[in-house]
């Protein structure tokens, strides 16, 4: 990737990662780009612990509509969330579990507020499997242990960023799309970020930062 296009968001990987961590700490979303030879997409990511209905509405409006809750394997086990399929043969091994809905406090589960309620229910410290109905309108993703150092995916990036910002290891993500329904690529993501004031970083930035700081 031509790094100069990302210079408005920091001149180095460390600057961009630190800007993203600070944005997370302030409860603001960030845009994360993966490798051009992978999905070549940009996801808008929020800390699961602080996401608001207004932020969820923005994800739904400007994203693909598939809003995902990225959580650790430990959390998946706590909630008894099995994989969506027995044999995952997707290209990038995206680790969807069964979909979920909060058992209480929601109506149809589709609205922004309902999805936030489902997420809050799922990440609660004392959450148990019966707190959730299955299926639902939130798509959990199981992050691999080791984060982006093990798998260079948006799932792992969101969990890593949440941890680095001092939050529970859980992030909410959605792929950004263009007005015509096509997937937003790097130039589109940069313009989107400038329009709404988001930080931008790449998964490569996060890998480099973690390796350099041994975290």
From Swiss-Prot:
What's its job?
Answer: Catalyzes the conversion of D-ribulose 5-phosphate to formate and 3,4-dihydroxy-2-butanone 4-phosphate.
Q: Which Enzyme Commission numbers does its entry carry?
A: 4.1.99.12
The record's note on quaternary structure and interaction partners says: Homodimer.
Protein name, per record:
3,4-dihydroxy-2-butanone 4-phosphate synthase
The UniProt record gives the binding positions of Mg(2+) 2 as: 39, 154
* Listed pathway(s): Cofactor biosynthesis; riboflavin biosynthesis; 2-hydroxy-3-oxobutyl phosphate from D-ribulose 5-phosphate: step 1/1
InterPro entries xrefs? DHBP_synth_RibB-like_a/b_dom, DHBP_synthase_RibB
Binding-site list for Mg(2+) 1: 39
- In this chain, D-ribulose 5-phosphate is annotated as bound at 38-39, 43, 151-155, 175
Return the Pfam families for the record. Answer: DHBP_synthase
């Amino acid at each position: 990737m031509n790094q100069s296009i990302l210079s408005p968001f920091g001149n180095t990987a460390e600057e961009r990662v630190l800007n993203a961590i600070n944005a997370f700490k302030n409860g603001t979303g960030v845009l994360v780009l993966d490798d051009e030879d992978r999905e070549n997409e940009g996801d808008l990511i929020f800390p699961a612990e602080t996401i608001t209905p207004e932020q969820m509405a923005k994800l739904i409006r400007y994203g693909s509509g598939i809003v995902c809750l990225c959580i650790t394997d430990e959390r998946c086990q706590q909630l008894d969330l099995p994989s969506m399929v027995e044999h995952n043969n997707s290209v990038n091994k995206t680790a969807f579990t069964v979909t979920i809905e909060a058992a209480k406090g929601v109506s149809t589960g589709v609205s922004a507020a309902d999805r936030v309620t489902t997420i809050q229910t799922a990440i609660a410290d004392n959450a148990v499997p019966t707190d959730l109905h299955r299926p639902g309108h939130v798509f959990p993703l199981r992050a691999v242990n080791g984060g982006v150092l093990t798998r260079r995916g948006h799932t792992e990036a969101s969990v890593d960023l949440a941890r680095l910002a001092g939050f529970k290891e859980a992030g909410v993500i959605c792929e950004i799309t263009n007005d015509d329904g096509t997937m937003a690529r790097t130039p589109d993501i940069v313009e989107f970020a400038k329009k709404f004031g988001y930080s931008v970083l790449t998964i490569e930035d996060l890998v480099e930062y973690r390796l350099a700081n041994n975290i």
